[in-house]
Amino acid sequence: EPKETRHDIVKGYVGFKGVPVSSADAFYACMSEYTFTKDDALKLGDVLGWCFNDFEKDPQSLNNKINLDAFQGNFSGWDGSYRPLEKLIKASMNDDSSYKHVSTVYHLILNKDPHAVVKTTFRGTNAYGGVVKQTVAARVNVRTGEVDSILDN
């Protein structure tokens, strides 16, 4: 569903369950994290039920959940590339018009220091005119979707 629809669903759910409106953002983050890190076939009602169970046990527990919309929104629906990393790669290339995306993979680390490692493999022309294949890895802030740093391969 579109982001606005998801926000409306969460607001309606929170109201229906009698949860304070001030907790709506935490519920949204919980729903975002679960739906992005679990099975694609999950139903929002089930996921929000899990969030509600967590909330009933400890209302503060949802404060650790992360809204992954910014991170998720930076992936291209066309080729799966991670746009902020692709932009940095092209900016550092000899001939950015030779850039050809091959693949992008990511690994989420959702601990006390939540971030993602995003790796993009691409082809491009080097300074000598030869086509080379390279992989660049970056540490990404999952809250903002921005690249924090390029990692050594």
Task: Annotate each PLM feature.
Residues E1-N153:
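Cystatin/cathelin-like cysteine-protease inhibitor module
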